[in-house]
Amino acid sequence: MAEHPNVSIVKSMYECFNRGDLDTIRNKLFAKELVWRLPGRHPLAGAKHGAEEVIAFFNELVKSNIKVDLVRIDAWGDDTVVEVHRGYGRVGDAVLDALNCTHYRIKDGKIAEVQVYMSDQYGADNFFSAIYEYAPIPARLAKKS
């Protein structure tokens, strides 16, 4: 059975990420209206809007030495891909190694919406909080105005 084209899109994103080819991800795989949601209480958590914000987020993941390996991936219907991946990395004493699930909505052959589900949210929060500092409170409050 041939691989579903939407599965190929998500696999391509992982391959490009792991070899550091963020330009291909931005220009060929991401929709302009992309929304990427990452849960948690750490500096990288929250919704990212548009390809540029997601690529900036990916750049931070690269700095954190995170690696991702697909474990399982399947397409459902014409616009949905769900996968399980292992996310792992180490920076100093901060270590992350967890299986996560991600839901993708594909529109017009591009990734348009992503929701990540963390199997070890506490571990992810600790890992990213150990690496990245929060902006000072006045700067965070100013963003909300």
Each predicted region: which residue ranges?
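C-terminal and inter-domain tail/linker signature
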Residues: 1-145
